[in-house]
């Protein structure tokens, strides 16, 4: 029994393992180019069966714990390997040995406590390596990266346990485009640890405290282009002038991201700008200033300028003690050389006039997403403010009057580019005043409904996108670029209003078509973006757009941006792919052809009817239908005649002088119905024939050549054909007055031809001795 249980347990383990392997294989999806995606699929190991066809493998965000030297040995062509956000705690020595073509390796956010240089010794082609977020304390006992000559991006460290940087750590690295070091708890930095790297384009340092920051700066200041400091509290930062005062610096840009300052540490940073003379650009992003701006007490006035800083960017600056903040007058003298200033999302409602006047070199000012209004703008754009300002961005502030805004900016004599988008103007006055050199104006997302002559005639670029405009009828003789997307325009603007227009963006309106003539009317048009409209794919429109190869060079969003909205059977299709039927595109020709065909058909029908007596058949059909509406057989009391006689007018002598004498003067007499005397005057002759036959017990047909040629005899015979012969009775009596060639009987008298072949008929004898027998037989036939 225990043996059986043991066997069952072994088989269960094998089956579950096979199911797990099958599940993992099915969880990995690969496309024909060798890109395999297995991220976020709860994998606990690297799937088996990987081949040399795999070029990119994404296994991030799984539960993989172990990488063996067999997992990837066949992936010799692998270039990208993503193993981030797993539970990897062990990587065997030769796990990546066969990946000689690998260029991108991500091992971030795992549980690696020790790093080994043997992992990377064969990765000569590696360009990107991410080791962030693991639990190691150091970068190993030997140089990790000495075998990576092509490495350009390196990310190392973690936020908790990484505490030491040693001189050997970066040995072998000569040039890096980006180096990111996460060392919030860094305790030991051995001098010259980063000095071995001769050139670093961008260094990102995550440091909680600035204790070792100056030591790091000393090593990199001569080989670094851009330094980015993240998540750092600079409350205790102190800049040592002697440390770098005599060094050749190459740093051009400083970025502070999520950094905390005090008044004191801010002054220390300003000192740094003076001594690192190469700094041209400074950026503060999502930083906090824990102070009140009392820089005068900190001897800031002894600093004459900000070094060579030309560009200053501040985004999302937080000042907890904002209402206690000083007037910043102590920093005014430092701003004389600054050319570009951006202050976004920082609750700026006023730039003091005195500060504006000190910004004598300012050419670009961006105050987007702040609280500027016309009242405060009046103080900011005071006399002599920003004398060389060319570009002013006031996007998403609290401006409401377009007329007043233009008047307030008249002091800016050199202003040529104004962005006042995302303000709530609603309407536009008929006339406005603007600085005389205005060339670019952005009024997008301002909720305006119409455009007026308020716009300056000197404009070369105008953006009125995302408004409520339904027309454009302004004359702007110098306008070169028009951005008017996401409005309610139904057609392209009139080209005569815009004679030098070269770029037009008009997507997302309700335009349903445009023509070659319209585009040709813009002689200098080089780029048109008109996608996202509700195009009616008419034949002319499709012929124009699909037949002009050069059009693709003008339509910048062709072909994917152009979709049909009508007709319904091509709705949603790309204009380039839509096809219409011949009848839709050449309706007049098709209608003409159909009319011609109908005419020919009618003509052919008429010829055939004449040739095959079609009209006669129609008349007979009508007569038959008339007869159908009457009882099949008249009641006995309605029978008025013993026989109806159908004969030709040319045979009337025989009928009236011989037949009538022999039958009506016989005893007992027979009552005959003759059309000459018994038809009702004024009644339609067809109805007379039908009524007479129905009121007669028998119908006598006097057949002769004249009978066959008689029109009325044909009617009488054919009615009998429909009414009497189809009843399979003996109501019809045929008298052959003279011999008739059966071939002379028309084909339409098929019933008569058949009867003459199958039924006995009475033949008028020319011998007088036989005529008495003829009359005797005729009387007997009538009585039967």
From Swiss-Prot:
Instruction: Tell me where on the tree of life, at the top rank, the source sits.
Output: Eukaryota
Principal localization? membrane
Sample GO molecular function, one term:
triacyl lipopeptide binding
State the signal peptide span: 1-20
Q: Does the keyword Chloroplast apply?
A: no
Identify the keywords attached in UniProt to this record, alphabetized.
Answer: Cytoplasmic vesicle, Disulfide bond, Glycoprotein, Immunity, Inflammatory response, Innate immunity, Isopeptide bond, Leucine-rich repeat, Membrane, NAD, Receptor, Repeat, Signal, Transmembrane, Transmembrane helix, Ubl conjugation
Spans of the LRR repeats are 54-77, 78-101, 102-125, 126-150, 151-175, 176-199, 200-223, 224-250, 251-278, 279-308, 309-337, 338-361, 362-388, 389-414, 415-437, 438-457, 458-478, 479-500, 501-524
Give a short account of its post-translational modification.
Ubiquitinated at Lys-754 by PPP1R11, leading to its degradation. Deubiquitinated by USP2.
Please list the residue ranges that the record places on the Cytoplasmic side of the membrane: 609-784
Domain LRRCT, by residue range, is 525-579
Which sequence ranges are listed under topological domain Extracellular?
Answer: 21-587
Instruction: Give residue numbers for sequence motif ATG16L1-binding motif.
Output: 761-778
Cite the position(s) of the site with description Interaction with bacterial lipopeptide: 349
Q: Where in the cell is it found?
A: Membrane; Cytoplasmic vesicle, Phagosome membrane; Membrane raft
Where would I find the Glycyl lysine isopeptide (Lys-Gly) (interchain with G-Cter in ubiquitin) crosslink on this chain? 754
Report residues carrying sugar chains.
114, 199, 248, 442
TIR domain segment(s): 639-782
Protein family according to the UniProt entry: Belongs to the Toll-like receptor family.
- According to its UniProt entry, what is the function of this protein? Cooperates with LY96 to mediate the innate immune response to bacterial lipoproteins and other microbial cell wall components. Cooperates with TLR1 or TLR6 to mediate the innate immune response to bacterial lipoproteins or lipopeptides. Acts via MYD88 and TRAF6, leading to NF-kappa-B activation, cytokine secretion and the inflammatory response. May also promote apoptosis in response to lipoproteins.
> What information about domains appears in the record's comments?
Ester-bound lipid substrates are bound through a crevice formed between the LRR 11 and LRR 12. The ATG16L1-binding motif mediates interaction with ATG16L1.
This one is known as Toll-like receptor 2
Organism from which the protein derives? Capra hircus (Goat)
Its organism's taxonomic lineage begins at:
Eukaryota, Metazoa, Chordata, Craniata, Vertebrata
